[in-house]
Curated annotation (Swiss-Prot):
The modification Phosphoserine is found at residues 60, 80, 529. It is found in: Nucleus; Cytoplasm, Cytoskeleton, Microtubule organizing center, Spindle pole body. It comes from Saccharomyces cerevisiae (strain Lalvin EC1118 / Prise de mousse). Residues 119-799 form a coiled coil. This is Spindle pole body component 110. Residues 96-110 have a biased composition (Basic and acidic residues). Belongs to the SPC110 family. Residues 28-46, 67-78 have a biased composition (Polar residues). The gene is SPC110. Component of the spindle pole body (SPB) required for the proper execution of spindle pole body (SPB) duplication. Potential role in cross-linking filaments or anchoring other molecules. It is essential for growth. Residues 900-927 are annotated as: Calmodulin-binding. It comes from the Eukaryota. Its main location: nucleus. It holds the Pfam family Spc110_C.
């Protein structure tokens, strides 16, 4: 920081304002009342319509160029020698001139120096002057080295910024297209830069020529040097102005390049997002491939299940045929039994039992047929559901095919467009070749993936079509089989109805036969009553016959009891079978249960009839017992009819033997039939269990089918979402392609501009180096002049004191002017360096502001800060609304605001100081000219 900015208010009396800062001076002793430069301006001085002003701290003294902090220590502006005036009359304008200028230091020296030791004092002064000159020479060398290092570091920093600008130049073209005014301004600036280049080249040539002249001239030619320096100062001022204009132009270009760099970064982020979305599309496509394979496997499983169902339906048809054959066989047996029953009326009880058994078998067969029919109906429902699912899958596959075809066409079009755009970008841009190649690779991968998906889809489509055709054939075959089975079932129902009708007819016939048997029994009773008398007569003869007959009756009773027991066992087994059938029939539909109930009622009626017949048989047995008693009584009467009775008994015995044989055969056949029915029951139970498992598996499969349908719906939704995202990606790709074209064009233009900027920067560095070399050469020249002064002072005699005083004062004045000039050059150099540093800092802050407005993340090492942006040109062409710090700053030289009192006062003070400095400069020049004339007139020749 500058010491001038921290001086107390009282020290302002000794300060001199120059175009580049404050300088301590003994001349500036006027007691002018100055407005405090650190005072905060009042808000009322500005526009009255503005709002309240924000508070801020008291600023430093140097408020004119406070942002730059340009000024070095004030000690460097101190006079290295006191000013010497010899025989100079006082100026008539004493009010405008400092009192310090009236001092003549020669008189003071004469007063202070004792006359006895002039040589010693002179040696002491010379020694002190040598020390001071040596120290000053060292300081000047160090300052020169520091300036050179600072310039080199500044050049390196500029090169870094130039490299950054190069990387961002290809994005400036968008601003030029959007804002034609900036293009026109830029053209004018380019013309001005060309003019400046030409001028700089001419100035460089002039400087080289003048350097050669200065080096070739002798040391004594100081008047020419002074004139040349004045010309150089003027040219430097002009060059500084031109440099400022060029720097402003460079700042504008850098700001534009920063904005374009931010846009480029945003577009790069968009490209990255696009790449990520393409990767997501790839992953989604892979997932869909896996889902398609999974669905193919499910279709294969369904085809296998359909084949199994077909095989099972064939087995069921075979079982139905077998049962139909069994029903036919049982019908034939019924017919045979009916014929036998008609032939053997006395054996009605056994035949009725056989009829019951056959009826039970028929009922069981009907129940089995009903269960098989229900199973067939369930399987038909399953087949219908499977067909519906297959049709749905076919429709979805067709939709997928159409969607994939549209996707393929769209992707082909987009791929063709992308390839054309990528070829153009390869020819025009080198920086984006890698990105474009990556995009091409990804597009090719997507094409390959789509081609693979197409192949797999076509294969799956062919497989599914073949499977569907085969399943359609199977379904048609099954439908035909079902029709045949239904026809057979209708025929069976008709036959059963006919048999029921025949059974009713046979029942009526049996009732008629019962009536005839009762009549016969009554006739036999009458005959027995007639025979009683005969039997009483023949009782003695038939007593032995009676005993034999009783034995035979007891054996018959035993056989009947055994038959009853076997009948009870068979009835128990039949009841168990009925219970099992009822349990199985509970699973059958309600219609079949009603039919079974009706048939159970019929069976119960038949059992009641059988019981009645058994009661009748028991009554007949009681009658037979009575007949036996009567027979004992009528033995005497039956002597005559014994032969007839014996014949009857023989007939009865033969009938009993036949009935016993028939009973045995019936028992055997019943056992065989019971075993067969047990086997059939076991088989039916196994089939029932298998059907239940199939039913459960079918329900599970229906659930799986519903889940698959849901998945297919989800896949359709995902497909629509993917299509929408694909359209978005196409739009974004078109935007990126247009942006790429813009950036390519801007890159070409910026490459041209960057070359011009490089040339300008190289020239600036050369000029700086020339200035530094001139400063060092001037310092060496001053040192030589001082040495010559010392030598000339030693050579001069004591008599020529006036001439010596004139020469000393002349060289002192010249030395002071040169020192001031060197100090001014140093201050200018520091000012330029600091302006460059602030310019770079401002560029960084502008980039930060642009990145913040575009939401771009900054690097971690950038710790700069920017309060607000105050470029009128930038805000005019950009609608960025940066918040300003104060209301007063909303107006100004760049914002068309009325000047505040402080700025006006400081400008007036600067003008006054400039006037004073010009006056002092003219007075010094007059003094130098007068001294030179006096020396020339006294010596008659030029002595320097």
């Amino acid at each position: 920081m500058d010491e001038a900015s921290h001086l107390p208010n009282g020290s302002l009396k000794n300060m001199e304002f120059t175009p580049v800062g404050f300088i301590k001076s003994k001349r500036n002793t006027t007691q002018t009342q100055v407005v405090s430069p650190t005072k905060v301006p009042n808000a009322n001085n500005g526009d009255e319509n503005e709002g309240p002003v924000k508070k801020r701290q008291r600023r430093s003294i140097d408020d004119t160029i406070d942002s730059t902090r340009l000024f070095s220590e004030a000690s460097q502006f101190d006079d290295s020698f006191p000013e010497i005036k010899a025989n100079i009359p006082p100026s008539p304008r004493s009010g405008n001139v400092d009192k310090s200028r009236k001092r003549n230091l020669i008189d003071d020296l004469k007063k202070d120096v004792p006359m006895s030791q002039p040589l010693k004092e002179q040696e002491v002064r010379e020694h002190q002057m040598k020390k001071e000159r040596f120290d000053r020479a060292l300081e000047s060398k160090l300052l020169g080295k520091r300036h050179i290092t600072y310039a080199n570091s500044d050049i390196s920093n500029k090169e870094l910024y130039i490299n950054e600008i190069k990387s961002l130049k290809h994005e400036i073209k968008e601003l030029r297209k959007e804002k034609n005014d900036t293009l026109n301004n830029y053209d004018t600036l380019e013309e001005e830069t060309d003019d400046l280049k030409n001028r700089l080249q001419a100035l460089e040539k002039e400087l080289d020529a003048k350097n050669k002249i200065v080096n070739s001239r002798k040391v004594d030619d100081h008047s020419g040097c002074i004139e040349e320096r004045e010309q150089m100062e003027r040219k430097l001022a002009e060059l500084e102005r031109k440099l400022k204009t060029v720097k402003d132009q460079v700042l504008e270009l850098e700001n534009n390049s920063d904005v374009q760099s931010l846009k480029l970064r945003s577009k790069e982020d968009e490209l990255k997002n696009l790449m990520n979305e393409l990767n997501e599309l790839k992953s989604n496509a892979e997932e869909k491939d896996t889902q398609l394979e999974f669905k193919k496997n499910e279709l294969r499983k369904r085809t296998i299940e359909l084949n199994e169902l077909k095989i099972k339906s064939d087995e069921m048809d075979l079982q139905l045929k077998q049962k139909q054959n069994e029903s036919k066989r049982l019908k034939d047996e019924l017919n045979e039994l009916e014929t036998k029953f008609s032939e053997n009326g006395s054996q009605s009880s056994a035949k009725e039992n056989e009829l019951k058994m056959l009826k039970n078998k028929i009922a069981e067969l009907e129940e089995e047929i009903s269960t098989k029919n229900s199973q067939l109906i369930a399987k038909e429902g399953k087949l219908a559901s499977l067909m519906a699912q297959l049709t749905q899958l076919e429709s979805k596959l067709n939709q997928r095919d159409s969607q994939l075809g549209s996707r393929e066409e769209e992707l082909k079009k987009t791929n063709d467009k992308l390839q054309k755009d990528i070829r153009i970008a390869r020819e025009e841009t080198v920086s984006k070749d890698e990105r474009i190649t990556d995009l091409q690779k990804k597009v090719k991968q997507l094409e390959n993936d789509l081609f693979v998906i197409k192949k797999t889809h076509s294969e799956s489509k062919t497989i599914t079509d073949n499977e569907l055709e085969s399943k359609d054939k199977l379904i048609k075959i099954l439908e035909n089989d079902l029709k045949v089975a239904q026809e057979k079932y209708s025929k069976m129902e008709k036959e059963l109805k006919e048999r029921e009708f025949n059974y009713k007819i046979s029942e009526s016939k049996l009732e008629d036969e019962k009536t005839t048997l009762n009549e016969k029994i009554s006739n036999l009773a009458a005959e027995n009553s007639q025979l009683k008398n005969k039997i009483e007569d023949n009782s003695t003869a038939t007593h032995h016959m009676k005993e034999n007959y009783e034995k035979q009756l007891e054996s018959l009773r035993k056989d009947i009891e055994e038959y009853k027991e076997s009948a009870k066992d068979s009835e128990d087994k039949i009841e168990e079978l009925k219970i099992r059938i009822a349990e199985n029939s509970a699973k059958v539909s309600e219609k079949r249960s009603k039919d079974i109930k009706q048939k159970d009622e019929q069976i119960s009626d038949l059992t009641q009839n059988l019981k009645l017949q058994e009661d009748e048989i028991s009554s007949l047995k009681s009658i037979i017992d009575r007949y036996k008693k009567d027979f004992n009584q009528l033995k005497s009467e039956q002597s005559n009819i014994q032969h007839d009775l014996n014949l009857q008994i023989l007939n009865l015995e033969n009938k009993l033997i036949e009935s016993e044989d028939e009973l045995k055969s019936l028992r055997d056949s019943q056992k065989i039939e019971i075993e067969n029915w047990k086997r059939k029951y076991n088989n039916l139970s196994l089939e029932n269990d298998r059907l239940l498992t199939e039913k459960e598996s079918a329900s599970d499969k229906e659930r799986e089918i519903s889940i698959l349908n849901r998945k297919l719906d989800e896949m359709d939704k995902e497909k629509w979402n993917l299509q929408e995202s694909k359209e978005k990606y196409k739009r974004e790709l078109q935007k990126v392609i247009t942006a790429n074209d813009r950036l390519r064009r801007e890159k070409e233009e910026l490459n041209e501009n960057s070359n011009n900027i490089r040339i300008m920067e190289d020239k600036m560095t050369r000029i700086k180096k020339n200035y530094l070399s001139e400063i060092t050469s001037l310092q060496e020249e001053n040192r030589r002049l001082e040495e010559r002064l010392i030598l000339n002072e030693r050579r001069k005699d004591n008599d020529s004191t006036m001439q010596l005083n004139d020469i000393i004062s002349y060289y002192k004045l010249k030395y002071h002017s040169e020192v001031r000039h060197n100090n001014d050059l140093k201050v200018i150099n520091d000012y330029l360096n600091k302006v460059l540093a602030l310019g770079t800092r401002r560029l960084r802050l502008d980039t930060r502001k642009g990145e913040h407005s575009l939401n771009i993340s900054l690097p971690d090492d950038d710790e700069l800060d920017r309060d607000y942006y105050n470029s009128h040109v930038y805000t005019r062409y950009h609608d960025y609304e940066y918040p300003l710090r104060f209301n007063l700053n909303r107006r100004g030289p760049y914002f068309e605001r009325r000047l505040s009192f402080k700025t006006v006062a400081l400008l007036v003070l600067a003008c006054v100081r400039m006037k004073r400095i010009a006056f002092y400069r003219r007075s010094d020049d007059n003094r130098l000219r007068i001294l030179r004339d006096r020396i020339e007139s006294s010596s008659g020749r030029i002595s320097w």
